[in-house]
């Protein structure tokens, strides 16, 4: 009896196992939608990884006009950024020097490139030779002061803080130690790009450009070392308005370079501290403008506003060779205060797009014969500046 019961029990177990195997064999394969949902869940889990468990990466940063390489990862990381404030005398213009206050030894400071969702850890050092404390306010950071209090650092000291890059865009960073305007006017600003998770479209060339206004005791061109003039700064009357900290920083031998047919992207900032820029490239139309460095895209734009403490991203294809002049189209700033740059483009001419001069003939004017004699001699126009002659 016991043997019969045991045999019956074993038979039932085999039957159950066979049934389970049959059910497993009949289970449907995972659908693409389910796979995508699983991948999305995994990505969400990665995005929510505590900062202490993220992979650690040292940021690749660049001096203007160079741009750090595009982000090629699809996950967040802890990105370490080292910054040093340095006060140093450098050339402002031919024969003119200025005592700049800088991030990492030049104006603008290095460009930083991170990914949306990254945790940015900033190691902020103030060179022992500095005369005053410095700090940094990241417009890309969410939280009081943008990190200014956390990075307030005396000469010869190092401070560390971190923030999460929550929103993609192109953002200014600047010193925010009082008097804030003076620190910015002396050159303490730069750009940080927070790439969207999906990245930016690939282009052929990228450049980093920041406009700034400078307030010197002497007038533009006055020789020697020029001190900062607070009265001119408060009155918003700069002697110099320049790209990348110096007259001619991206012109002549320092001109930006591209080839006909290439698409160019410019990351444009405005450190200010006072003036709003009307950024324009003479002879080009911006195919795309990421308005104020954000998500909104405008198309077919001739000039774009870049506010003080703000930015814009502009893209355009250069169709034909030539020297394309970058200006603040508040035009006296370009030809009389220094806001000029050059993009030199090589390649084959294309007369379908634009020809050279086809003719040059005499013209007497439609009303020349009956025009009355002038009652007074006409005032002569001032001679064109050297920069105007080189542009037009």
From Swiss-Prot:
Q: What is its EC number?
A: 1.7.2.1
* Protein topology in the membrane: Lipid-anchor
CDD domains, per the entry: CuRO_1_CuNIR_like, CuRO_2_CuNIR
The record's comment on cofactor binding reads: Binds 1 Cu(+) ion.
Name the residues that bind substrate: 139, 280
Q: Where, in this chain's numbering, is Cu cation 1 bound?
A: 134, 175, 183, 188
The record ties this protein, via Pfam families, to: Cu-oxidase_3 (PF07732)
Signals that turn on the gene = By anaerobic and microaerophilic conditions in the presence of nitrite. Regulated by the gonococcal fnr and NarP homologs.
The record's sequence repeats, renumbered to this chain, cover: 368-372, 373-377, 378-382, 383-387
Question: Which PANTHER family does this UniProt record tie to the protein?
Answer: FI03373P-RELATED, MULTI-COPPER OXIDASE
Give the quaternary structure.
Answer: Homotrimer.
Protein name, per record? Copper-containing nitrite reductase
Q: Which gene encodes it?
A: aniA
